[in-house]
Curated annotation (Swiss-Prot):
Assigned EC number: 2.7.4.6
Taxon lineage: Bacteria, Bacillati, Bacillota, Bacilli, Lactobacillales
Name under which the protein is recorded: Nucleoside diphosphate kinase
Function, in words: Major role in the synthesis of nucleoside triphosphates other than ATP. The ATP gamma phosphate is transferred to the NDP beta phosphate via a ping-pong mechanism, using a phosphorylated active-site intermediate.
Source organism of this protein record: Streptococcus thermophilus (strain ATCC BAA-250 / LMG 18311)
Gene: ndk
A GO biological process held by the record: UTP biosynthetic process
């Protein structure tokens, strides 16, 4: 069974959208194997976003991701990585179609891709790496 890592980001937590996001996951038939609400830390964020850690905009990402609690988790199901990415919608909320999580809930100004409600691994390799970073598995 395929697994993926997800984050319900601080903007969604602040707006009380956790239940609505989880409802969509469960209605799709995916199994939430692990889940935890926590304050994300800079050390693991640098590891998670390793390809961005030396970019000039990384401090903005880090500051946002540490601005409040987030929900991290592991879900599983057939084709969960692609399906979850489709459910999330385009990374830029302004490009996200209605019916996707970002299209329905994201309120970031067009072009601001940081507060975009959710994160999901983009490949099996990324999922394994992100699960190890956040859950030690």
């Amino acid at each position: 069974m395929q697994k993926t890592f997800f984050i319900i980001k601080p903007d969604a937590v602040k707006r009380h959208l956790i239940g609505q996001v989880l409802d969509r996951i469960e209605r799709r038939g995916f199994v939430i194997e692990r889940m935890e609400m926590l304050m994300l830390d800079e050390e693991r964020l640098k590891e998670h976003y390793a390809q961005l850690a030396d970019k000039p905009f990384f401090p903005s990402i880090s500051e946002f991701m540490m601005s409040g609690p987030a929900v991290i988790g592991i879900m599983s199901g057939p084709g969960v990585i692609k399906s979850w990415r489709d459910m999330m919608g385009a990374t830029n909320p302004g490009d996200a179609a209605p019916g996707t999580i970002r299209g329905d809930f994201a309120t970031a100004p067009d072009g601001d891709m940081i507060p975009n409600i959710v994160h999901g691994s983009d490949s099996e390799e990324s999922a394994a790496r992100e699960i190890k970073i956040w859950f030690g598995e």
